[in-house]
């Protein structure tokens, strides 16, 4: 970073601009401790550069002002002086001013306005008073660089429509004058689009109902287009195509008011006059596209159905289906008319190409009919493709393929793939290797000759053609290959192609993959080709073969393809026996229940369960066989009043389940348990006798069992 003293000295005698601009940028340490006098000194030195008579110094000062405009303090203190000096420089520009200097000055003025716009106080004090002068100077210098100044005026129309209102008609007349000039056809497409888009934004300066002005302008353009299409009726028999007549009647006519477009003059004896017709159609279609694509600050209703009718009407005028009139007999005149029709079709395709990106799913109802019209644009020779015409009109075919891809991409699956057969064949035809016509004709003449050589020297170049014919092939341009790749990429992911066409597509993909193998050494594969290869693997169609090995050899580090090459399944779960888990759970439950049962057993032994036990009425000793029967669970369930047998049964169960039970210190219950289990009942009648004994209505009472007694 340069210190402030060095910057001031450099502004006095400028030599290199980059270090100065980098040191003055926003956030630089220079601004952290700059004083007020130093700031005034910096601004005055910069303004002195802009007042120099040397153009380089003025250009140097303009670029420094552009950097200083990011500083709020400088613009708040000296903004009015800076803007005034810039407007003086713009006023001094003339036809001898260099384009670099002029563009730098205009960009600096726009940057200063952008830095002020949005700040209420600065906008009120600096920008609003100077806006009329800025717009007026832009219109005054309009002839210096029309396309550039129109692009710079568009933001002022959107941001300041009220201030721009007095200049709206003047700008509109200048734009229309440029559009209707003969030189407009030589402008690049980007410049043409700028003029058309800016003209559509002028509707925002209307004081009342700008949306109505927008709609009326659009319908007037559509009516003018309909009138222009009827001129082709002077050369072609529209009466032979009833559908075309219906289409033209559905398109609204222009109003009876005076049109902004002058009438066309076409002389049948002057072939060059025919090209004014497609030029007028191109202007109208570009203007319609500008009205549809340019952003507006108001809500506008778009007649999408009429727009679709306009495109359909232009594409339906085709000399393949509509014959020429008898008056048109000259073959050269017919060929010129065919060429003008193709130019008109190209303009309509330009409008059709942008519609999917604007209206999306609203175009789906018109998609099938549009694709049918696009298929008719492919040159045919009887029932087969005219490959020579397809190759000769390579750019037009690429535009058709782009429109097809844009419309098919609106849906996730397109069912009617039979209508795409011609389009696929045409796409494959323009990417095939070609040989020049001169070499092919020379080769044919050589083969048809009788072997007589007039001169030995004449056969030298022909020998190269015969032995190394591949060196004379014309390579397909990269742009054409990209168009076809994009078209194929959309088709294989949205439609199931017929077997023959799918094989052609796969062959094309494999050839492109092999051609791209040299990119492996460079480490990069084009993104579009990468997507095409991946989609070709993901959508194999009805074929049993796969190009996965070839694609994997090229895209080795692709994560998606690595899943197909080395499938990674989820980790295998270990099988666990449920029985073991249940046994462990039972053991845990038993271990938790053992202390409780031990406490219950201790209470039973010590006679502490007085609350749960039912005291018997008598203390008679029960016979031995009766005591054994009480331990059976079935007998216990019969008498709900007796709870003592249930307690003894649970105690027995808890003790018998343990292999080596740990006896409590004062627990002496195991002895009566062993005595009760000593005799075994093997007869089934024992259980029956037990039930009969319990069901007997005798006066037998349950004696109290004294577990504390010592049998020994």
Curated annotation (Swiss-Prot):
Give the residue ranges for region: Disordered.
435-456, 575-712
Where is composition skewed (Basic and acidic residues) in this entry? 609-625
* Coiled-coil ranges per UniProt: none
Q: Where is the composition biased (Low complexity)?
A: 435-450
**Principal localization?**
nucleus
Task: Tell me the GO BP annotations in alphabetical order.
Answer: rRNA processing
Record keywords, A-Z: Nucleus, Ribosome biogenesis, rRNA processing
Record's subcellular location: Nucleus
Q: Where is the composition biased (Polar residues)?
A: 643-659
Instruction: State whether it acts alone or in a complex, and with which partners, per the record.
Output: Component of the RIX1 complex, composed of IPI1, RIX1/IPI2 and IPI3 in a 1:2:2 stoichiometry. The complex interacts (via RIX1) with MDN1 (via its hexameric AAA ATPase ring) and the pre-60S ribosome particles.
Q: What does this protein do?
A: Component of the RIX1 complex required for processing of ITS2 sequences from 35S pre-rRNA and the nucleoplasmic transit of the pre-60S ribosomal subunits. Regulates pre-60S association of the critical remodeling factor MDN1.
Q: What is this protein called?
A: Pre-rRNA-processing protein RIX1
Q: Which gene encodes it?
A: RIX1
